[in-house]
Amino acid sequence: MSARCCAGQLACCCGSAGCSLCCGCCPKFRQSRTTRFMYLFYFILVIALCCVMMTPSVMKQVKDHIPFFEEFCKKTQAGGDACENLVGYSAVYRVCFGMACFFALFCLLTLKVNNSKSCRAYIHNGFWFFKLLLLGAMCSGAFFIPDQETFLKVWRYVGAGGSFLFICIQLLLIVQFAHKWNKNWTAGTVRNKLWYASLSLVTLIMYSVAVGGLALMAVFYTQWDDCMDNKILLGVHGGLCVLISLVAISPCVQNRQPHSGLLQSGLISCYVTYLTFSALTSKPEKKVLDEHGKNVTICAPDFGQDLHRDENMVTWLGTLLLIVCISYSCLTSTTRSSSDALQSRYGAPELEVARCCFCFGPDGEDTEEQQNVKKGPRVIYDEKKGTVYSYSYFHFVFFLASLYVMMTLTSWFHYENATIKTFFSGWSVFWVKMASCWMCVLLYLQTLVAPLCCPSRQFSV
């Protein structure tokens, strides 16, 4: 069994075979999923490397424990004479440039691939050892790019544009997810009236979360005679939640879109509340002198100040959350259903089957593979009849995610003094989250108002 396992893993690393787990008690995996998880693993490796590079103490530790390191830098000129370019925001820019080029290359390589038996599909699904070497070579080669100042300046604007597009894709998916959720559960009310209770309960919970969240932020992030900017922010966002709720149930919208309702607006309101909270926690601390002449932080909760004192815990928890969120966004936005949602392609309402877990396919899907699961190999080749997701679009999303990670880790446009302890706070981070919040509201309103403005055009929502 061990020899067979080693042969299988060797074929996975150096050939086109799919990857799997060796132990007999481990579940079998579909090739389409293992491929995406392997690319995600490479992506997380590079993020971890970037986080290390943003840690100020790393360079000192490396110089102290590796005697030939400084001499190596002088000879290769890869990190400057004193290796100063191997850490900090410039190093993250270079490493993320290499990772972005890696995914851009595979995006072009897999264009128009619809058959998993093609040569390019074999390259996409296998040869993991050689792809790891290629990724390492691209990230390392970025340190030898001439005219570093021009490169960093141009790449910064490319990163900002790509990050904006990545955020737009995620916001579009959230809006379309809300519409799909309501449409699926509403379809269930035709056969079972209990779906009305489910719709009402979930809607009530989401509005309770949104109202409660805004109320708690008003208590902890404002003061009676200060924090006017926070008060205005909470008032505006609360007003936006009320606006989208009224528009969603207005008669003119209901005539054109009978499936529009409070479930979608409740979900968007919850997301607006989350982004508002995230933005407020990202604002730089505001300090004033009290009556005793001591600096005190205002417009922030006391427990938040105590938490910020434990910088290591906040930093690493935030880093872990960042990795989880980006990984989830990349994987969920590259499925076939998500691609259809971005193009507003859905099944006919009469064909909708209401399910609690409506994100996944209906029961009985892929029955052929399930019947052979006990007899087949450790990998289920689920793309025999065609690809189950767009290879090129998958790599394009990871290309944009690479740019988003680069801008996030370097505090967007306040990159000079950025470290791993500061990339979750700052005015750039605050305004990016605010812009994301407003853009989400506008995208949702667009899906409601567009059919009214263009009555002759068919909108599938």
From Swiss-Prot:
Report if keyword Lipid biosynthesis is assigned.
Answer: yes
Pfam families linked to this entry: Serinc (PF03348)
Q: Which residues lie on this side of the membrane: Extracellular?
A: 1-36, 112-125, 179-200, 253-260, 334-392, 444-461
Q: Does the keyword Endoplasmic reticulum apply?
A: no
Q: Which UniProt keywords apply?
A: Antiviral defense, Cell membrane, Glycoprotein, Immunity, Innate immunity, Lipid biosynthesis, Lipid metabolism, Membrane, Phospholipid biosynthesis, Phospholipid metabolism, Transmembrane, Transmembrane helix
Biological process annotations from GO? antiviral innate immune response; myelination; phosphatidylserine metabolic process; phospholipid biosynthetic process; plasma membrane phospholipid scrambling
Q: Which residues are connected by disulfide bridges in this protein?
A: none
Q: What parts of the sequence cross the membrane?
A: 37-57, 91-111, 126-146, 158-178, 201-221, 232-252, 261-281, 313-333, 393-413, 423-443
Q: Which residues lie on this side of the membrane: Cytoplasmic?
A: 58-90, 147-157, 222-231, 282-312, 414-422
Entry GO CC: centrosome; cytosol; Golgi apparatus; myelin sheath; plasma membrane
**Glycosylation, residue list:** N114, N184
Write out the similarity annotation.
Belongs to the TDE1 family.
PANTHER family given for it? SERINE INCORPORATOR, SERINE INCORPORATOR 5
The role this protein plays is: Restriction factor required to restrict infectivity of gammaretroviruses: acts by inhibiting an early step of viral infection. Impairs the penetration of the viral particle into the cytoplasm. Non-ATP-dependent, non-specific lipid transporter for phosphatidylserine, phosphatidylcholine, and phosphatidylethanolamine. Functions as a scramblase that flips lipids in both directions across the membrane. Phospholipid scrambling results in gammaretroviral surface exposure of phosphatidylserine and loss of membrane asymmetry, which leads to loss of infectivity.
Q: What is the official name of this protein in its record?
A: Serine incorporator 5
Source organism per entry reads: Mus musculus (Mouse)
Q: Which gene encodes it?
A: Serinc5
